[in-house]
Design a protein with these regions (language model features):
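Bacterial N-terminal signal peptides that target proteins for export
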Residues: 1-9
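Compositionally biased, intrinsically disordered/low-complexity regions enriched for serine, proline
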Residues: 4, 14, 26-27
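Residues at beta-strand starts and edge strands
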Residues: 6, 76, 86-88, 138, ...
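Bacterial N-terminal signal peptides
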Residues: 8-17
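Non-cytosolic coordination micro-motifs
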Residues: 23-61, 94-175
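Mid-chain, structured segments of secreted extracytoplasmic proteins
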Residues: 65-109
Length: 175
């Protein structure tokens, strides 16, 4: 099982310099980006990477771009968030249809341990499992803060008797 998790973990850890920061350094966004990148420059970078902006929307006063086509194992979608045309958050959404709950748990545990090695003990921000009608919803989240920047690691699952949806996301944020 862990052999299949390690390629995902390696890809996640290579996603950007945020995992290589030490001490109280600012957490940097993935893909060698910088906080405050302009939306114009991001559009050019995404075009150069042959990625597609599949949707643009407004989320809580921020412009959000749903992007597909960034090459990374298991990465289904990346969401870039802008305020005033400047990058303030990057959300990496990982999904693999052939993974069960145990594989997601193992992957999340490995990522959490790596983050703790870099940034110390994370803060548990959510751990709940509760029904919503005939759907059982699970939400587990951890957060690490450094110098007005943060990483959140979130697992979400919704399971009914006939369907299941699972996703793991890593949110890089600046405040």
């Amino acid at each position: 099982m862990f052999r299949s998790i390690f390629p995902w973990l390696a890809a996640l850890l290579l996603a950007g310099p945020a995992f290589r920061a030490a001490g109280a350094e600012e957490i940097k966004p993935p893909f060698n980006l910088r906080w405050g990148e302009t939306s114009e420059r991001m559009a050019r970078l995404l075009t150069g990477a042959k990625a597609r902006i599949v949707a643009r929307r407004n989320v809580e006063g921020r412009e959000a771009w749903d992007v597909e086509g960034l090459v990374q194992v298991g990465l289904k979608r990346t969401v870039f968030y802008f305020i005033g045309g400047e990058l303030v958050e990057v959300e990496l959404q990982y999904q693999k249809p052939d993974w069960d709950e145990t594989k997601y748990d193992g992957f999340m545990g490995d990522v959490r341990r790596r983050l703790e090695q870099r940034y110390g003990q994370g803060q548990l921000i959510s751990r709940k499992k509760e029904p919503e009608g005939d759907v059982m919803q699970t939400l587990v989240g951890w957060k690490w803060n450094q110098n007005n920047t943060a990483i959140e690691l979130i697992y979400f699952a919704a399971q009914s008797p006939k369907q299941v949806f699972r996703t793991l996301s890593v949110h890089y944020k600046t405040y």
